[in-house]
Amino acid sequence: MNALQQKCRPKHQVLVLKCYPRTAKGAVDVKPNSSELSYLLYYATSRRSKIQKIGAFLEKKTASDVWRLRIGNVQVTLQILSALMEKLHKDSVLIAPFVLKILDTVLRSDDITMIESSLPTFGAFCDYHDAAFLLADQTYLRQYEEIVRLYAQLASTAAPGRESLTTPVKVRWRNAGLEAIRSVSTADALSSITGSQMHVIMPRILENLWSDTPDFLEILHQRLEEEEKVDTEKQLRRRTSIATVGTDGANDPNPVALSGTAGDVDKLAEEEVGVLAMQCLKSIFIVPTRAQIHGATVSLLKFIQEKVAQGNSVVELHDDRERDNGWAISIYGIIARWAPVQDRYTILVAALETLLRIPAQDATLDEQLALVTIMSSLLRSDVNLIGLSMMDVLLGLIKQMRKLFRLRSPASRSDDGNVATAESDTAVRQKNKHLVGRLELCIGDLATHVYYADQIADMVSAIILRLKPSRASSINSSPGGEKNGNEAGPGASTVELSESQQFDHYFCISTGRASGLRAIKEILLVANPQKKLTGNLAMSRNPVPIHVWEGTHWLLRDPDGHVRKAYMEAIVTWLDRETSFASEIAVEEKLPRSRSSIKMSKEASSGINRRAVSNASHRERGSKPRPSQFLALLHLVIYDNALQYVDFETDLVLLHILLTRLVLQLGVNAARYGLPMIYRLQEDVQEIETPLHKVRIAALCHGYFWALSEKFDFKESDIGQAIESEVARRKRKAFWVQGINMPPPSLDQVGIPGEALPQPDWDSASLEREELLPFDDREALVESVVARYHESLQAPPGSPGSPGRNPSGPILGSSLTSTGQADSDVELPVVFREHMLGDWSRDAAAAMLAAAGKSESLTGSKTETTGTRGHLTVKTNGMNGNGLTNGHGPTSPYGSQYNLMRPHSSHGHREKEREGTIPRHRKGSVRSAHSPAALSTGNRGTVASVDQLKLVLSGNPPPKTAGLAGDDDSGDSMVSYDYSLSDMSFNPATQNDQPGSPTSVKRPGTSSKRGPLNTHPPLGGAPNLHEEQNGDGSVPPVPPMPDMNMLGGKRSPIQAMENSFQEKGRRRSLNSRNGDGMRPKSVRSQETKTMDLQDLLRGIDSRPSEGSLGNVTRPPY
C-alpha cells in the first residue's frame, strides 16, 4: 500500500521525501541525504515551475512535523530550504514567501532547538533574497517585518514568560535572537527605506549592551577587537599539512568556565552575549548608507531618553569635562568611530535634531543634559566630522538656549507661595542653569576641529549678530546716550522682553547676552588650546579679525554686571588668543568690503586703460572699505563707565584690566585712543567732588600710564620712574585701588561689577590734605612710546624659531614704492602721534562717531555728506586731521596737541577759534585742489608734474597728491591720499614766515627725522585762503598755494612735485632736464631745517607756455 502511495505522488514530493533519512523520533542534528538533495536541487533548477510546488509541500510538511515535535525532520526541512536559496538565488523570489511561512511556524513553536536550527536558513534568506520584492508585494513585506519582529523579541532581556528559566537557557534565547539580528543587519533589505527595521532591532541590541558597570562597554569593545584580529590572522595564515596536529589551543575552553564559580560562568556568558550584540551593532554602522546610520542613531538616542526617564544614570558629569564618562558617552563614541568618515556627521546631526524636538519642560531637563553631554564628548574628541555644517549646529544650539531662557523667564512661572514648590523651583532653576552652561561649552567644542579658514570668525560673528540690545541698555549705550542724567543704576536689571518672536531671533534678556558672550569665550579658548604668549603664528586658519567686534561696544554699557563682565572676558580672551605681534604694528583697521563693492572694484580695474574720468566715476560708485570704529567706541564707553560706576571698585578694576590688555596686545593701535581719553579722565578728576571717587579715577589713570611703561619698556627712564614713584607713593599712603596692578589680575579673581563692596577705611581729613599728583609730561610719554615702537620693529628676531619682527607688508595699505617700503614699515604714522597728543572730549567724540555712522547708513551715495564720516583713518580730515568735518562740522576731540591738564575754559576758547578757518568748498580732483578761488576765477589749476598726469590717465593714481581739509576717502578725487615717506621730511610748521604760530613749536629729537605733529589748524587762527590769493603776483599762471598748516595732514602739490623730482633723480640724471627750469632744492636733507616756498615756486618756469589753454605750464624738466 505504501509503495502504491509513493508511485501516485508527484515527482517533486518524492524527491523531497527521499532527502529525509530514517531516524528515531526526537533525534536532533539530523542532516539530509546528500545525493538525494543534490538531485532535488538539479530538478528545481531545470524545472523552475516546480519551485513553488516544492515550497508549498515543504510548508505543509513542516507544519505537520512541528505539531508532532519531529525536530529532526524540521532540521532537514530547514537545510533543504537553505540549499534551495543558495542554489536558486536568482529565482529566490519564487520560494521566498514559503520560507517566511515556514520560519513563522518554527518561531511560534516556542522550541529553542528548532529556533536555533532555523538561524542558518534565515541567514541564507537575508543574503540571497531580492530586496526590490519588498516594494512590489505588501503581503510579502508584512511577512518579512513580522519575522524580523519575532526574531528580535528573542533577544529581549525581559521577554514575558521566561522569568522562571535558568540563566543558561535565557542566554540561548538571546543568542538566537542576536544571531538573527546580525543576519538582518548585513542584508540589503535593511538599507532600503521600506525594509528598515531599526526601531525593532536596535532596542534589542542595546538591551544586551546595557549595564550599570562603567567599563562594561570598554571590555566588550576590547574583546571584539581581539576576536577580529584573530580572524584576520587566520585568513592570512598559510595552509598547513593535514597531518599536522593542531596544538594552538584556539578552541580550548575558557579557564574561567572550568575553574570558576557559577557566578563567574554566568558573567562570562553575559560577556559572550554582549560581544555578539556588539558585532550586530558594528554591522549596522559600518555600512556606508547614510539613511541606515541616521535611523540607527535616532533609535539609540531614543533608548537613552527612555533610560533617563526611568531614572537610570547614562552619563556621569564632573567639573573637569575630560573626566565625563558613562554608558551613553562610551557607546556614542564607539559608533562614531565605526561609521564611514563621510557619513559620521549624521550621528551628530541626529543628536541635534533629537535635542531640538524635546519640549522645553522641567521634566525633560535631564534628557537634554544627557544629549548635550554626548554631543560635547563627540565634538571635543579626535573623531573628524567631515561634511558637518558647523553653522547649522551652532544655530541649533543657540535655538535650544533660547528655549531654556524662555523657560526661565519670570512670565513662564507662577508663584503660589508654597515652600515646597519654591524649593523645587530653585532646584529646577539650578538644573536649568547647569544645562545652559553645558550648552555654552558645547558651542565652544565646535571649534575643536576647523574645517575652513574663517570658521571661528563666522561662529563668533553669528553669536554677536544675535545679541540684541534691550530697551534699558539701548538708552545708556554710547555714543547716543547722555553721560550723566537719570540713567539706570548699576544694579538695575535689563528689561525682560517676553515676546516669543524676539526670543526666537535674539538673546533679548541679560542672562541670554551673558550666556552668548561666555559661549564666544569658550570658542576662542577651544580654538587656541596651546596659545603661547608670543602668539600662535602657525595657525591653519585665519585669526578672528577685530572688525568682528564692530558695533558691540554697547554691551559694556549694559546695566547688568554679569553682561559687562562676560563682555570683558570675551574681549580679553580674544586679545590673548587671537592677536600676535602683527597686531601691534600701527595699521588702520578696515572693515571688510561688501560683495557689491568688490564687484564694483573689479569692474573698475577691468577698464584700467580707459579715460581717467571714467575710471574715477567707477571709484565713485564703488564704496571703499571704511575704517573700523570699534576701538574708538570702546574707549568712549570705558570713559563713560569710569565716571558712572565710580562707586563700585570692581568696575574700575575690570576697566583697568581691559585697558591694560588692549595696550599689551594691540600696542599703539590701542594707545592712540586710550591715551587721549585717559588724559581727559585725569582732567575730570578736578571736577569730582568726593575724595574717594577722585582716588579711584586717579588710580585708573595712573594704572594706564603704568601699563604703557611696562608695555613699551621705558620704566627705567625718567618718566617711567616718575610714574612708578607716584604709584608707590599712593600705595604707601593707602590712596590706591586694590586690583590696579601690573601685571593686571585675572578676571576670575575679580567680582561681579555693580556689586557694592565695603568702603575702605580711609581718613577723610588725610584725603583732603594729600595731593594726587597728575602726570603732565604727555609729550615725553608719547615720544617714549614712539621710540620704543621703532626699536621693537627694528629689533632682530630672538631665535630661529621665533617669528620675524619686521612686518611683511606695507602699513596702512599705502601705495608706497619699493624704495620706501622698508622705511615706512618702521615708522609710526603721523596720525597716531597726533591722536596721542590731541585733545579729547566725550561729546565731540560721540558726535563725530555718530555722524560717521549716520553717513555710512546712506545707500552708497557719494555726496557732500560723506565729509562727515569721521572714520578713524589717516585719509580722513573729518576727525583725525583738523577736527572739522567738511569744513564746518563738529570739533574733533583729537584736533589739538595742547592737552596737558589745561582748564576747560581755554579748551572751549580754542575750539571756537578753530571754527571757520577751513574753507567749505569741496575739492574733487588735483586740478582744483589749490584754493577755493580757483573755481570762480576760471583757472583750472596746475598739474605739478607730467608723470602725475600720465599716471592719472593710465588709471593708476600717483601715491602722493594734494587735497584740502574737508576732503575724505569718498573717491571724489581722481588721486586719493596715501601715507608716504615725504610726510616725514616736510614740516611746514618750521617755516620762518610764521614765527608766532603756536603749532611751530619744535619737539626735541623729532623735528629732523619725523613728520609734523601739528598738521591740524593752528590754534591761534590761520590766515584766510581767500585773502592770500593776491599776496604774490610774481608768478601769475600759478595760483597761490594755501597755507601748509591748513592741509590737515594731506600733501600739497608742491610737496608732491618735490617728491616726484626726488624719485626721478634716483633714476635719471639731472642733465636731461630742460634748461629753462631751475633745479629745486631737496627738502629731505638733514641740514636744511626750513624751506622757502617762494623759491620753490620760482623754480617752475611758466614763461614758454604762458598763454596756453587752462594756464597749464611747461613741466619743469
From Swiss-Prot:
Composition-biased stretches (Polar residues): 601-616, 856-868, 982-1009
Compositional bias of kind Basic and acidic residues: 908-918, 1076-1092
Record-linked InterPro entries: EFR3, EFR3_HEAT-like_rpt
Ranges for region Disordered: 473-494, 601-625, 792-822, 853-1117
GO biological process: protein localization to plasma membrane
Alphabetical list of Pfam families matching this protein: EFR3 (PF21072)
Any one GO cellular component localisation term in the record: plasma membrane
Homology family: Belongs to the EFR3 family.
Name of this protein: Protein EFR3
Gene that encodes it: EFR3
